[in-house]
Amino acid sequence: MAVPARRTSKAKKNKRRTHKGLTTPGLSRDSETGEYRMSHRISPDGTYKGRTIIEK
């Protein structure tokens, strides 16, 4: 089996893992209720972009 000739440094290891970081969710303030919610999602009262999508 192959064995690494040199030990991988912390910097090299961390540079390789930069893509594994967490990202913040896309939150936006709802214009009607003023609450934060996920972008491109229907609000709890069934409206999206000012239109009623789901009748309650």
From Swiss-Prot:
<keyword id="KW-0687">Ribonucleoprotein</keyword>
<dbReference type="GO" id="GO:0003735">
    <property type="term" value="F:structural constituent of ribosome"/>
</dbReference>
<dbReference type="GO" id="GO:0022625">
    <property type="term" value="C:cytosolic large ribosomal subunit"/>
</dbReference>
<feature type="compositionally biased region" description="Basic and acidic residues">
    <location>
        <begin position="29"/>
        <end position="38"/>
    </location>
</feature>
<dbReference type="InterPro" id="IPR011332">
    <property type="entry name" value="Ribosomal_zn-bd"/>
</dbReference>
<dbReference type="InterPro" id="IPR002677">
    <property type="entry name" value="Ribosomal_bL32"/>
</dbReference>
<protein>
    <recommendedName>
        <fullName>Large ribosomal subunit protein bL32A</fullName>
    </recommendedName>
</protein>
<dbReference type="Pfam" id="PF01783">
    <property type="entry name" value="Ribosomal_L32p"/>
</dbReference>
<dbReference type="InterPro" id="IPR044957">
    <property type="entry name" value="Ribosomal_bL32_bact"/>
</dbReference>
<comment type="similarity">
    <text>Belongs to the bacterial ribosomal protein bL32 family.</text>
</comment>
<feature type="region of interest" description="Disordered">
    <location>
        <begin position="1"/>
        <end position="56"/>
    </location>
</feature>
<feature type="compositionally biased region" description="Basic residues">
    <location>
        <begin position="7"/>
        <end position="20"/>
    </location>
</feature>
<dbReference type="GO" id="GO:0006412">
    <property type="term" value="P:translation"/>
</dbReference>
<keyword id="KW-0689">Ribosomal protein</keyword>
